[in-house]
Curated annotation (Swiss-Prot):
Classification lineage: Bacteria, Pseudomonadati, Pseudomonadota, Gammaproteobacteria, Alteromonadales
Protein name (database record): Na(+)-translocating NADH-quinone reductase subunit E
Family note: Belongs to the NqrDE/RnfAE family.
NCBIfam families: nqrE
Entry superkingdom: Bacteria
Pfam families: Rnf-Nqr
Catalysed reaction, written as an equation: a ubiquinone + n Na(+)(in) + NADH + H(+) = a ubiquinol + n Na(+)(out) + NAD(+)
Spans through the membrane: 11-31, 41-61, 81-101, 114-134, 144-164, 180-200
Family annotation (InterPro entries): NqrDE/RnfAE (IPR003667), NqrDE/RnfAE_oxidrdctase (IPR050133), NqrE (IPR010967)
Length: 202
């Protein structure tokens, strides 16, 4: 149990997708104007990462990895070259399902997210989570914990940034820094703050 807690905490703080690896910055910067919208997108990212990482773990280590098809009588088969297209296909299918669910049951959130919801398909934080799972050879349970933890970490980062940006609306920001300038500066300072977690050994 401690091992899974360690993976979960590390994926949120020490290995934060947005602030440690700078993945998913497109939606991270574009949708972080309002806390409510950021939370909605964050939940969507948690769902997609929490499902796509373990699903891709099953597919990769049982079908695509070198020697994975030994159970079918093909011990020398290596289909790992199909990894990228398979991972992206699974992610795209999950995002499409999520989009239909939001459109039907949460139309206000669906409208608020707009074009950024289908952009989760090409959000490199999602693919990054899957590729880190493959690189670290996580088992199914570790993949589930890592996927959910990475999603929670990304959501935490975007909600924090959105909260700061909402407060900055009432601040006297210098003209040259208004807009993306102050947003990049704020994100950089947040990343430096999250670096303080890197010294913690779990």
């Amino acid at each position: 149990m401690e091992h899974y807690i360690s993976i979960f905490v590390r994926s949120i703080f020490m290995e934060n997708m947005a602030l440690a690896f700078f993945l998913g910055m497109c939606t991270f910067l574009a949708v972080s104007k309002k806390v409510k919208t950021s939370m909605g997108l964050g939940v969507a990212v948690i769902v997609v990462l929490g499902i796509s990482v373990p699903v891709n773990q099953i597919i990769y280590f049982n079908l695509l990895a070198p020697g994975a098809l030994a159970w079918a009588g093909f011990p020398a088969a290596d289909l790992s070259f199909l990894g990228f297209i398979t991972f992206i296909g699974v992610i795209a299918a999950l995002v499409q399902i999520l989009e239909m669910v939001l459109d039907k049951y949460f139309p206000a959130l669906y409208q608020a997210l707009g074009i950024y919801l289908p952009l989760i398909t090409v959000n490199c934080a999602i693919l990054g989570g899957v590729l880190f799972m493959v690189q670290r050879e996580y088992n199914l349970m570790e993949s589930l914990v890592y996927g959910v933890g990475s999603g929670v970490g990304w959501m935490l980062a975007i909600v924090l940034l959105a909260g700061i940006r909402e407060k900055m609306k009432y601040s006297d920001v210098p003209a040259g820094l208004r807009g993306l300038g102050i947003t990049f500066t704020t994100a950089g300072l947040m990343a430096i703050a999250f670096m303080s977690f890197s010294g913690i050994q779990l």
